[in-house]
From Swiss-Prot:
GO biological process entries: translation
KW Ribonucleoprotein (keyword) present: yes
UniProt xrefs under PANTHER family: RIBOSOMAL PROTEIN S15, BACTERIAL AND ORGANELLAR (PTHR23321), SMALL RIBOSOMAL SUBUNIT PROTEIN US15M (PTHR23321:SF26)
Family of the protein in this entry: Belongs to the universal ribosomal protein uS15 family.
HAMAP family assigned: Ribosomal_uS15_B
Subunit relationships: Part of the 30S ribosomal subunit. Forms a bridge to the 50S subunit in the 70S ribosome, contacting the 23S rRNA.
Name assigned to this protein: Small ribosomal subunit protein uS15
Biological role stated in the UniProt entry: One of the primary rRNA binding proteins, it binds directly to 16S rRNA where it helps nucleate assembly of the platform of the 30S subunit by binding and bridging several RNA helices of the 16S rRNA. Forms an intersubunit bridge (bridge B4) with the 23S rRNA of the 50S subunit in the ribosome.
Keyword DNA-binding: no
Example of a GO cellular component annotation carried by this entry: cytosolic small ribosomal subunit
Annotated Gene3D superfamilies: 6.10.250.3130, S15/NS1, RNA-binding (1.10.287.10)
GO terms, molecular function: rRNA binding; structural constituent of ribosome
Gene: rpsO
Alphabetical list of PROSITE patterns matching this protein: RIBOSOMAL_S15
Length: 89
């Protein structure tokens, strides 16, 4: 259930600060959001896949922690990221 390299490269280009930026908070949140959206589509078809659902909940928790960190450290970057990804908060 991973993302293709093309999708990852597009996310890195859109949210990265420089060309090789893979670890900034914005990139991590954007990658997690793409994986979460991919898994949500998977669960519409495979309702009883509880093993993957546990992984989804871990990703949501990780994204929540990263967005809380970003909100605590830099509110402007946080609001820009939330608007760009279309997340609630």
């Amino acid at each position: 259930m991973s993302l293709s390299t093309e999708v990852k490269a597009k996310i890195l280009a859109d949210f990265g600060r420089c060309e090789n930026d893979t670890g900034s908070t914005e990139v991590q949140v954007a990658l997690l959001t793409a994986q979460i959206n991919h898994l949500q589509a998977h669960f519409k078809e495979h309702i009883h896949d509880h093993h993957s659902r546990r992984g989804l909940l871990r990703m949501v928790s990780s994204r929540r922690k990263l967005t809380a960190y970003l909100k605590r450290t830099d509110v402007a970057r946080y609001t820009a990221l939330i608007q760009k990804l279309g997340l609630r908060r």
